[in-house]
């Protein structure tokens, strides 16, 4: 026997989680619903590998020579850098570029899978998580962007989220670029300062307009005494940026009119406002007014996207870790990224897409009671009373007959006695067990114990002797009638569950 000191400690790496059967089944049911909507819209599934050449991930990497921050990377035997994918969009761009001549254009696809971030883990922040994306590559006009927003709205509603509990919020990178150009931050030379402005606007929900004003100016001192240096904009520029974030009106038409006033005279800004107006017209034509909203405060990802940008936000309250009521917030986002595929081809390739955070959306559905986490019915367990080869074959035939009839079943393969086997069946959430000892075998019979009904009756029969003598919820049937008898029990249990769920 190995010395205690030689035992390896079982430990899960930080930032990763194990997933249990109920979570896996609930996630699969949720993703099946998402697939139904995407299929309805005419999108096709595609799957890319978890590993890509590091240079294919492009702008996500801070250091191409030592790609060990932000992504998990390693070198193969010919010393080329490979990385676990950071998201699902960069691999799609590589796939489209590599198969460009054979794919239909526009190319409409969806995919779900694990992505990895080599970042410091924390509460709700993992190094491995699931995303579900849909993208259209090769469509230059905003009808493709509008379709993404409408598809996301339909997806949330198909999952059981009611209108009024969510909003798809839409902005446009070109409008903000017009504002930044107007305050003198045009060109690559101001890229760092532009990014600081974007980050300041992104804090609008957290700090409010006055907090953003400080971050756009000299900086902000928080309650703990920490100082965040600001973007150092002059007062007139700050007012211009804040006017942009406050341009939201009572409806889409008013918001668009406000934005037109903010960017008047700037060609790029005016182009962005017109794109929003075109999208708004499509939302109205499709019956999505009130579900999709033009909102200038949406800036998440604007440093990455090239045109329309959108975010799916859930509007109901939840209690956070500090016991405070807060709006649940974002469960997905996307936008137009016309530059990503072009990196591989040297020619313009327009693209737009949307990404859902699967784990976060599951949490939201759980809070709403809309996630299907109902207990899965376990397998019928055939108990093994006699372990000789001949009788094992008889038990095996029973379980095979049940499976052929489409009934989930297993034969106990452990080494314990009947009491332990019954405990095992209970832990497996078995609906019933099949028992055949020597007496039943000689009579050509089997006993079937309904564990669900047995639990219910046990609460009514308090005396142990009476319980044992009455053998509640246990029947004896001919061995050749096993399948029909088990099916009757399962059907009765299904009717009871349906009645209880009403």
UniProtKB/Swiss-Prot annotation:
InterPro entries with a match to the protein in the record: aa-tRNA-synth_II (IPR006195), aa-tRNA-synth_II/BPL/LPL (IPR045864), Anticodon-bd (IPR004154), Anticodon-bd_dom_sf (IPR036621), His-tRNA-ligase (IPR015807), HisRS-like_core (IPR041715), HisRS/HisZ (IPR004516), HisRS_anticodon (IPR033656)
Enzyme nomenclature, EC number: 6.1.1.21
One GO CC term, this protein: cytoplasm
Protein location: Cytoplasm
Family matches, as NCBIfam families: hisS
CDD domains, A to Z: HisRS-like_core (cd00773), HisRS_anticodon (cd00859)
GO biological process, one term: histidyl-tRNA aminoacylation
Reaction(s) the record says it catalyses: tRNA(His) + L-histidine + ATP = L-histidyl-tRNA(His) + AMP + diphosphate + H(+)
Subunit structure: Homodimer.
Pfam families with a match to the protein in the record: HGTP_anticodon, tRNA-synt_His
Keywords: Aminoacyl-tRNA synthetase, ATP-binding, Cytoplasm, Ligase, Nucleotide-binding, Protein biosynthesis
Entry's Gene Ontology molecular function annotations: ATP binding; histidine-tRNA ligase activity
Family: Belongs to the class-II aminoacyl-tRNA synthetase family.
UniProt enzyme class: ligase
The protein's name in its UniProt record: Histidine--tRNA ligase
